[in-house]
């Protein structure tokens, strides 16, 4: 394997997702970020927008029209923007990683149903690998088009996948509720992100019809009815998802444990969290700030056969930029953990 670093250009680097990819890439042993674009922050030092990167880079933002070629193009644009300009970006780099939802879905009709308009480049759908190494590691090897998985979808998919893959859930509705940090809404200000409206608030913002439902339905084995509800929380980072599902008669904790161990036993970023005592018995997104881990827990109701699954991630890392880096590592044949070694903080 060559030790020469791959050059990276980040398009839309002033937002939270692009900034998080930049943070991780600056510490990556095989990546060299050479360009970061932003229309609103052009000519400003990157550290003016991302103050946590002071002293880590001397890069300045440039306009996308000034984008030069790079080995890897990372698109951190608003949804529906990358698809409209994809041929422009394909001319700039061999490998493209998209952090938006533009290329995650394979079916243009499903895209239109969930996003409310026809896909701008339907011929592209199906050409991109869904950026979830836990499910698509082999597909990602050598991939040049990676569509990063959605954050809420990631928390749902990773919790459910082992049980569905092994046929371990009864054929009943699956209900997932996600408590989501404010950074998932992006860096642009809105009425709902205004401090007097958001601070201290727990607000249901998508009780039905969440767009990430389509991703989860596409990626998970089987065709169970799946229902997602999203609730905004006062936290900045993190998603804590609880999922109500049902196991076959006679199943116990040990059976659920065995399913997770069988599927995730060798996964570098999946941790099963189920401790008998203490305040950290189950997954907690506070402990995952800045990390690429997905912590998964569960509890059985033996009287009803209901199993409550819990998953926690940092929405900007495992839910976006970290998952993208992990996918890129697999695609390039690097150590899957490269650039993703941060273990989190406690207390925070």
Swiss-Prot record:
NADP(+) binds at residues 14-17, 315. It comes from the Bacteria. It comes from Deinococcus radiodurans (strain ATCC 13939 / DSM 20539 / JCM 16871 / CCUG 27074 / LMG 4051 / NBRC 15346 / NCIMB 9279 / VKM B-1422 / R1). Coiled coil: none annotated. Pfam families: Semialdhyde_dh, Semialdhyde_dhC_1. It is found in: Cytoplasm. PANTHER family: [LYSW]-L-2-AMINOADIPATE_[LYSW]-L-GLUTAMATE PHOSPHATE REDUCTASE-RELATED (PTHR32338:SF11), N-ACETYL-GAMMA-GLUTAMYL-PHOSPHATE REDUCTASE, CHLOROPLASTIC-RELATED-RELATED (PTHR32338). Keywords: Amino-acid biosynthesis, Cytoplasm, Lysine biosynthesis, NADP, Oxidoreductase. It catalyses: [amino-group carrier protein]-C-terminal-N-(1-carboxy-5-oxopentan-1-yl)-L-glutamine + phosphate + NADP(+) = [amino-group carrier protein]-C-terminal-N-(1-carboxy-5-phosphooxy-5-oxopentan-1-yl)-L-glutamine + NADPH + H(+). One of its GO terms (molecular function) is NAD binding. One of its GO terms (cellular component) is cytoplasm. Its main location: cytoplasm. The active site is at 151. Its EC number is 1.2.1.103. NCBIfam families: argC (TIGR01850). The lineage of its organism: Bacteria, Thermotogati, Deinococcota, Deinococci, Deinococcales. Catalyzes the NADPH-dependent reduction of [LysW]-aminoadipate 6-phosphate to yield [LysW]-aminoadipate 6-semialdehyde. Belongs to the NAGSA dehydrogenase family. Type 1 subfamily. LysY sub-subfamily. Pathway: Amino-acid biosynthesis; L-lysine biosynthesis via AAA pathway; L-lysine from L-alpha-aminoadipate (Thermus route): step 3/5. This is [LysW]-L-2-aminoadipate 6-phosphate reductase. The keyword Transport does not apply. GO terms for biological process: L-arginine biosynthetic process; lysine biosynthetic process via aminoadipic acid. HAMAP family: ArgC_type1, LysY.
């Amino acid at each position: 394997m060559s030790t020469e670093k791959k050059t990276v250009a980040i398009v839309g680097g002033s937002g939270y997702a692009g900034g998080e990819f930049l943070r991780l890439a600056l510490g990556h042993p095989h990546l060299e970020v050479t360009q970061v674009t932003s229309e609103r922050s052009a000519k400003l030092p990157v550290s003016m927008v991302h103050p946590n990167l002071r002293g880590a880079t001397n890069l300045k933002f440039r306009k996308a029209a000034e984008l030069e070629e790079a080995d890897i193009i990372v698109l951190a644009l608003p949804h529906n923007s990358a698809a409209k300009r994809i041929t422009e970006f394909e001319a700039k780099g061999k490998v493209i990683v998209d952090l938006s939802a533009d290329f995650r879905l394979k079916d243009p009709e499903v895209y239109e149903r969930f996003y409310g308009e026809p896909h701008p480049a339907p011929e592209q759908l199906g050409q991109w690998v869904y950026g979830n190494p836990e499910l698509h590691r082999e597909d990602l090897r050598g991939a040049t088009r990676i569509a990063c998985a959605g954050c809420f979808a990631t928390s749902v998919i990773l919790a459910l996948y082992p049980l569905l893959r092994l046929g371990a859930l009864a054929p009943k509705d699956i209900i997932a509720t996600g408590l989501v940090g404010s950074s998932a809404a992006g860096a642009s200000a809105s009425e709902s992100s205004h401090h007097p409206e958001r601070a201290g608030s727990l607000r249901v913002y998508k009780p039905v019809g969440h767009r990430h439902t389509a991703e989860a339905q596409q990626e998970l084995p089987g065709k169970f009815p799946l229902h997602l509800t999203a609730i905004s929380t006062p936290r900045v980072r993190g998603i804590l998802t609880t999922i109500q599902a049902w196991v076959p008669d006679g199943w116990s904790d040990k059976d659920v444990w065995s399913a997770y161990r069988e599927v995730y036993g060798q996964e570098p970023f999946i941790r099963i969290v189920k401790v008998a005592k203490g305040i950290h018995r189950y997954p907690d997104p506070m402990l995952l700030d800045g990390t690429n881990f997905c912590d998964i827990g569960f509890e059985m109701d033996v009287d009803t056969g209901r199993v409550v699954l819990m998953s926690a991630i940092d929405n900007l890392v495992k839910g976006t930029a970290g998952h993208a880096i992990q996918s890129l590592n697999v695609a390039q044949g690097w150590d899957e953990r490269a650039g993703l070694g941060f273990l989190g903080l406690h207390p925070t």
